[in-house]
Amino acid sequence: MSRIFLKLISIVFLISCSDNEEVQNTEIITDSYFFQKKVFNMNLYNCTTPIENVDSTYKKTSDSLNFYKFSELTEQDNQIASCTQTYTQINELTPLKSGLLLGLSYMELSNCNSKVEEELLLEDLAPYLEYLKENDVQVWTGISNLENNSFLWINIWKSEEYREEFLLEWINSDNSGKFAIALSSSARCQNPSTYLFL
């Protein structure tokens, strides 16, 4: 009796696992790649005088007044005389563009204030991030955790020229107004500082 029951179970299992070319299901994962997103410790220094003997793991501007490092391991580095240090954890939002963190980095950094909780802020950013992904925009984006409703928004672009071309197209598109309205209800950002790191 148990032998017949096992055969019956096996037949049902085989039928359910067999190929059926007529039925194809596609599952859309709304936050795909979430499991691949990284958190980086960022040390950023803005100095009043050039600093020449900077650790080689840092990228610096040509005038040696600004330098930064993203690291998954290193925590806050030491203070440096005549420099303002910013240390924070940056949550990667565009993991498919992490290759832009290598080589030259054209960084855009904005200080922002959130009007909503962090979860709602990320929900409001989702259409913008999806647009970047669908249109293969060459920008890496990350934000810091909220602290007293403040956060840093960082974009690292392929190049300064690429950023300028993208922004020119973006400003003249319907998307910019649509996303600006959605984001303005969640956060307000200051004009960004930009740096070319070597």
Map each language-model feature to its residues.
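C-terminal motif of bacterial Sec signal peptides marking the signal peptidase cleavage site
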Residues: 15-16
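Outer-membrane beta-barrel domain signature
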Residues: 174-180
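Short S/T/G/P-rich N-terminal loop/turn motif that feeds into the first structured element of a domain
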Residues: 20-174, 185-198
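Sec-dependent signal peptide recognition
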Residues: 2-11
